[in-house]
A protein has these predicted regions:
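C-terminal motif of bacterial Sec signal peptides marking the signal peptidase cleavage site
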Residues: 6-9
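Small-residue-enriched, tightly packed secondary-structure blocks
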Residues: 11-220
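Sec-dependent N-terminal signal peptides
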Residues: 1-2
């Protein structure tokens, strides 16, 4: 009986570590498929990514509603160093809730460009809620999403999304991003703050190299 608890704990740690790597792998695929398909939207996104300070990749956001709508998903945050290289990822959860007469299911992939230090700092400050900070401008562009390239120019945050489902579009307004410290700890083997991962870049996991390479391919 004394062996059960340690083995269970070990299995739990392995599951969490695997979940973190799977999220990184799915994020890599999202970057590749959304930015590498040759469409005008992909080309526009690539231009913004080349100027971005950081990027948030959410490989799957699921939204469902029947009178009460909810939205959520898991994401990774990666920032660009002064040298141009990309950091390893910090892990985040995204969630929001809305009320209204809405029936349907929506599935979306999202790439969110943080265009400057102001946007990155706001994102790193505890919970970040889109639309809550009047000093942070947000533009949303993408298939099934309202917006235009023109409105994105000069925005602090630019969101590209590929949406599917019964809703006509997706709005990230009101979405709250929170750091997933458990995934960070499991992925890097230590208790670590998101700033140490994406700002001072004191963490490394070779499993994130394909994601970093994919961002370098499209974003320089």
């Amino acid at each position: 009986m004394s062996l059960v608890a340690p083995l269970s704990a070990c299995a739990g740690n392995t599951d969490t570590s695997n979940a973190a790597q799977e999220l990184v792998d799915r994020s890599t695929l999202t970057v590749e498929t959304m930015l590498g398909n040759g469409s005008s939207q992909a080309n526009q996104a690539t231009q913004f990514l080349r100027r971005a300070k950081a990027v948030v990749v959410c490989p799957r956001i699921f939204k469902a509603g029947f009178f009460i709508g909810g939205e959520g998903g898991q994401c990774v945050l990666v920032s660009r160093a002064a040298t141009g290289s990309w950091s390893d990822p910090a892990f985040y959860t995204m969630g929001s809730g809305s009320f209204g007469l809405q029936i349907g299911v929506q599935d979306a992939e999202v790439i969110m460009m943080l265009m400057n230090d102001t946007a990155l700092t706001a994102f790193l400050n505890s919970q970040f809620k889109i639309g809550a900070d009047a000093g942070i401008s947000v533009a949303t562009i993408g298939a099934g999403v309202g917006g235009s390239t023109g409105t994105a120019l000069g925005a602090d945050i630019i969101t590209f999304a590929k949406a599917r489902g019964l809703y006509g579009g997706i709005s990230l307004s009101g979405s709250v991003f929170s750091n997933d410290s458990a995934l960070d700890q499991q992925y890097y083997g230590q208790i670590i703050d998101p700033r140490q991962i994406v700002v001072t870049m004191n963490a490394n996991n070779a499993g994130a190299n394909p994601l970093r390479a994919m961002l370098a391919k499209f974003g320089g």
